[in-house]
């Protein structure tokens, strides 16, 4: 059995197929975690969702900002933009089944290997959150996605406030902060105020901001966190950090990491991608 994480696919199903072929993926033997942004900007979003839905327990996805945007568009809470490539899902004959599968996916996952813990999110983890708290907060939002008031939740999900976490937050303010941290976060202030204006590489952080994973006192240090979302960051491999968005949809690569007997044993595997859209 092999364990993998794969970064942002964004509707590039042909690249995903090549990557799975490259690693000789076997659904009966292997487990693959997909770190969100399964859809949008690439040409094959519906195909990606179908592959994931039929993959069962061997393909385990979590939600990114583009996946939530698809749900919002499908429920009339947001209009697709000119750069969105969601029509293949929204007009598909199996649309309802694909969307039902998507809304049942979590915003964070964990995996245990040889007594070690792997925490997976799409974008980031707030410095004040432990791994347990991250999973608990993600479960709060997942419950909303499966509730009767889903269209209202998706309508109210958008926005940048509040930009600072407090355990006292409640209702939509609380859930929006959770969504933003797990699916949009790149930079924050050293004391944890979230920034949503900057998407530069980590070494070009604007004044007063740090990458979320370098915030002082981050409580998930010591737990391996794998994430995507940040294509200008690219591949990053630290003892407690794995960044896996290598810009497939922009003509970069689709990246996977294969773990060995422990989480410290890692192999980076990637395939080149055709450019589906230009950055910007």
Curated annotation (Swiss-Prot):
The organism's place on the tree of life at top rank: Bacteria
TM helices/strands, residue ranges: none
A molecular-function term among this protein's GO annotations: bis(5'-nucleosyl)-tetraphosphatase (symmetrical) activity
UniProt cross-references to Pfam families, sorted A to Z: Metallophos
Function description: Hydrolyzes diadenosine 5',5'''-P1,P4-tetraphosphate to yield ADP.
NCBIfam families found in the cross-reference section: apaH, PRK00166.1
Family, per entry: Belongs to the Ap4A hydrolase family.
Name used for this protein in its record: Bis(5'-nucleosyl)-tetraphosphatase, symmetrical
Annotated source species: Paracidovorax citrulli (strain AAC00-1) (Acidovorax citrulli)
């Amino acid at each position: 059995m092999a364990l993998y994480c794969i970064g942002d696919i964004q509707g590039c199903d042909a690249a995903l197929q090549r990557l799975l072929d490259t690693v000789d993926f076997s659904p009966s033997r292997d487990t693959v975690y997909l770190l969100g942004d399964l859809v949008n900007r690439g040409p094959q979003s519906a195909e990606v969702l179908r592959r994931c839905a039929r993959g069962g327990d061997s393909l385990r996805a979590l939600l990114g900002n583009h996946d939530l945007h698809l749900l919002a568009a499908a429920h009339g809470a947001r209009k697709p933009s000119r750069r969105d490539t969601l029509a293949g899902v929204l007009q598909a004959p199996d649309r309802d089944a694909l969307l039902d599968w998507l809304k049942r996916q979590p915003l964070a996952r964990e995996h245990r290997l040889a007594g070690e813990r792997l925490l997976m999110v799409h974008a980031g983890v707030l410095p004040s959150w432990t791994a347990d708290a991250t999973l608990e907060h993600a479960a709060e939002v997942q419950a909303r996605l499966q509730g009767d008031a889903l269209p209202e939740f998706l309508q109210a999900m958008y926005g940048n406030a509040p930009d600072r976490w407090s355990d006292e937050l409640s209702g939509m303010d609380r859930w929006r902060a959770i969504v933003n941290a797990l699916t949009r976060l790149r930079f924050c202030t050293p004391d944890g105020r979230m920034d949503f204006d900057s998407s530069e590489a980590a070494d070009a952080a604007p004044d007063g901001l740090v990458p979320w994973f370098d915030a002082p006192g981050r409580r998930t240090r010591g737990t391996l966190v794998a994430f995507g979302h940040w294509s200008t960051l690219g591949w990053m491999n630290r003892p407690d950090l794995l960044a896996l968005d290598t810009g497939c949809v922009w003509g970069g690569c689709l990246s996977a990491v294969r773990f060995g007997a422990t989480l410290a044993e890692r192999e980076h595997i990637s395939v080149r991608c055709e450019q589906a859209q230009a950055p910007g």
